[in-house]
Amino acid sequence: MRAVVTGGAGFIGSTLVDCLVGRGDNVLVIDDLSSGSDENLTAGRASELGSVTLEVLDVAHENTTKVVASFRPDIVFHLAAQINVTHSVEDPINDARINVIGLLRVLEGARLGDAKKVVFTSSGAIYGEVDESQLPLAEHAQRKPLSPYGVTKLAGATYLDAYGAMHGLGGTTLALANVYGPRQDPHGEAGVIAIFAKRLLADRACAIFGSGEQTRDFVFVGDVASAFLKAGDRNHGGLFNIGTG
């Protein structure tokens, strides 16, 4: 199978790439390396099997459509995104440029390249504030994002559905909880487990702000990669929450 993975040099994307090449897929990674690293691609099975091509490119650049289409993928996994909620509030235009325009570049490439399916990475941020009585959260819960980031991730799922209706492009959206695991950036705002692990290894105390009673759903990156593979291999679409519960 021929697969495109945008954001494939990131910690989630590179884990997915390892799984894809492990089963024999030919993979094109599109990543601008602004937060990912090509070292993530040489650290796993990608370097062993030699079936990965890296295209260093901003996903929102107009060339993305041509690059995706010319690869003639069977499937596209779209993980490239601006993921910092604070940055989305400070610069919502750039957030939309990457998360909305970037998605449209990829969708057009998938359509023109006759891809069978796109798997889109969304987020629990599409639901906004959730009362604990609603947990574990079901996919039919009200979607009321409270940040530009959450808005773009909800818009992305809607665009994917529209491309299915207009062009017959298969699509599945995965709304991820807080992902943790190897290759995670210990400096990111969502990387609390990586941050704690780094501090513990350095024999330093871990700081918890607020009441200490906050709850978050964390999911291991390997389980997320498995969810992507299952979403790609199955015909049904729609939106699925991916978490531990």
Locations of the language-model features?
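Residue-level signal for the nucleotide or nucleotide-sugar donor/cofactor binding architecture
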Residues: E90, I98-I101, H140, S147, ...
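A glycine/serine/threonine-rich, flexible loop-to-helix segment
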Residues: S133-L135, P186-A194
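Glycine-rich Rossmann NAD(P)(H)-binding loop
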Residues: T6, V179-R183, I208-F218, F240-G245
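Alpha-helical substrate-binding/gating segment
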Residues: A194-C206, R216-N241
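N-terminal Rossmann-like NAD(P)+-binding domain of SDR-like oxidoreductases, especially those catalyzing
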Residues: M1-V179, G232
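Hydrophobic aliphatic residues
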Residues: A80, A110, G188, L200-L201
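A short local structural element in Rossmann-fold oxidoreductases
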Residues: T65, Q184-D185
